Amino acid sequence: MSVKPTLSKPIGGQDASSPAVVMRRLWPYVKPLVWVLVAGVLAMAAVAATEAGIPALLKPLLDHGFGSKGDMTTKLYVPAAVVGLALARAIAQYASGYLLQYVSNRILLDLRIQMFERMIHTGVSFFQRETASTVINAVVFEVNQVLSVLMGVTITLVRDSLTVVFLLGYLFYLNWRLTLIVAILLPCIGWLVGKINRRLRRLNREHQTLTNQLAYIVEETVGGYKVVKVHNGEPYEIGRFNELSRKLRGYSMRMTVSGGLAQPLTQFLASIALAVVLTIAVVQSANDQTTVGGFVAFVTAMLLIISPLKHLMDVNQPLQRGMTAAELIFGLIDEPREPEGGGKPLARASGAIEFSHVSFSYGMSRDGRQTLDDVSFTVAPGEMVALAGPSGSGKTTLVNLLPRFFDPSSGSVRVDGVALPEYSLRDLRNQIAMVSQDVVLFNDTIAANVAYGQAPERDRVEAALRAANLWETVTAMPDGIDTLVGDNGMRLSGGQRQRLAIARAIYKDAPILILDEATSALDSESERHVQAALETLMKGRTTLVIAHRLSTIERADRILVLEGGKIVESGSHRELLEQGGLYAHLHRIQFQQDAG
């Protein structure tokens, strides 16, 4: 069942976002640049004014400059005025383009930075709720859509509206009777073009959807090429690719048919308008009511007005696309931040941990059962406690409460006798190192990965790598600790990736360690190196470990056995085996698997 993304939501608590609401949200970003924006708009107004200048120069030239008896002054000043007008237009056009792009790029920078900062400071529940592609799309791509509304619609409304106003004003000045006729016919042209454009927009959306589906098929086939080949899936993949390609071709042809109608029909209706104007103009000229120059200037201005009118009619499409993008962007910006905590400083904890009647639920299940239910235990400084139990018993949820990825629904978690919310969140997390079975490495150097979150000190990096039994491997690499590990450490083996994650925890030197042991199979040599690195890491630290290896469980000072969100057994390895309960059952199953 598909789940509707929660990141995109109407802005300002409305049922649907409106341009006015979006502009109010954008105003704080625009305000520091308002005078730059005003200058850009004025430059656009100058560009619009020059549109009416061209037909205005044709009239005196045709009326007074042509023929042997033409006025010499008119013959000289009109060409000079054309050059001057073109120069003024070019300068104004460049100025408006530069100034508006300056505003656009500055707002883009501010929005992206704020979005990334908010994303990185949201709670863990946000990352569990939203897909990575949704967040990436919002931060990287959708910002451009909002700025397309801000700049594109602004340019269209200002430049083309002013162009229409100037040209209509000039038309009324030349001949108000003919202008009234044009004013009646032009909306008909606009209605027809708008209807064709609506169909084109729908076809474009469907075409884009099919294009994305086609790209996804290629991506799936390339990424899963081994499965495709082993299962002889080539005919299936070729079949669905060909089917979608044929659909795509059909939509392309329908777009060609619809798009091809727009220009001929527009030209046909414009020709009707022109024929009506010509007829009336001939009648008026017979009665000496118009001149050749006035007629040519009128027709030129009439033809020039069609393009900006079309742009104004098409403004709704980018506007609606921008509204959708704005909902995604401000949905991210409005996400609540993680709680900062009470601000109590914590330089270095002794490592004492206490869970007191802790309950937690991600959302009540149908039977009303919670993920953790009234869990209580203490861990002494330097003690190693292993968490065991079947899948879904609450082990990972329990350790996630310690760095405050989540807060308990009831009860409290304490470090050194102080409830976690009282500590500064940054100071609290400085006390905790975490090594997960899902190793996360960044596309950076080995040194940067080891010292992640801190400035790399080469001596400390070397010491951490030695302690993790990885130093000899690193020194054999061409660039040593400056070697790039690739996307999530793809240039390293599985065992090397795990040891690099352990080296990162050693470098942090936190008094509390959370260890989720890897279940992935390693060769015996890698297993030996990883086990030795873990022993070094756990030495002298308070350790909570979600144990998968028998050797780790047996070495723990105490084992807590969870089932259904409750601690059902507690004791040492030997004590729990003697009890013959759930732990003994799990141990027997794993021992048989290991023996097998």
From Swiss-Prot:
It is found in: Cell inner membrane. Pfam families: ABC_membrane, ABC_tran. The keyword Cell inner membrane applies. Its EC number is 7.5.2.6. Residues 353-589 form the ABC transporter domain. Keywords: ATP-binding, Cell inner membrane, Cell membrane, Lipid transport, Membrane, Nucleotide-binding, Translocase, Transmembrane, Transmembrane helix, Transport. GO terms for molecular function: ABC-type oligopeptide transporter activity; ATP binding; ATP hydrolysis activity; ATPase-coupled lipid transmembrane transporter activity. ATP binds at G389, P390, S391, G392, S393, G394, K395, T396. It is an enzyme of class 7 (translocase). The chain crosses the membrane at residues 34-54, 80-100, 138-158, 164-184, 263-283, 292-312. PROSITE patterns: ABC_TM1F (PS50929), ABC_TRANSPORTER_1 (PS00211), ABC_TRANSPORTER_2 (PS50893), MSBA (PS51239). Its main location: membrane. InterPro entries: AAA+_ATPase, ABC1_TM_dom, ABC1_TM_sf, ABC_transporter-like_ATP-bd, ABC_transporter-like_CS, ABC_transpr_lipidA, P-loop_NTPase, Type_1_exporter. GO terms for cellular component: plasma membrane. Residues 38-321 form the ABC transmembrane type-1 domain. In MsbA the ATP-binding domain (NBD) and the transmembrane domain (TMD) are fused. PANTHER family: ATP-BINDING CASSETTE SUB-FAMILY B MEMBER 10, MITOCHONDRIAL (PTHR43394:SF1), ATP-DEPENDENT PERMEASE MDL1, MITOCHONDRIAL (PTHR43394). Belongs to the ABC transporter superfamily. Lipid exporter (TC 3.A.1.106) family. Homodimer. Involved in lipopolysaccharide (LPS) biosynthesis. Translocates lipid A-core from the inner to the outer leaflet of the inner membrane. Transmembrane domains (TMD) form a pore in the inner membrane and the ATP-binding domain (NBD) is responsible for energy generation. This is ATP-dependent lipid A-core flippase. It comes from Burkholderia mallei (strain ATCC 23344).
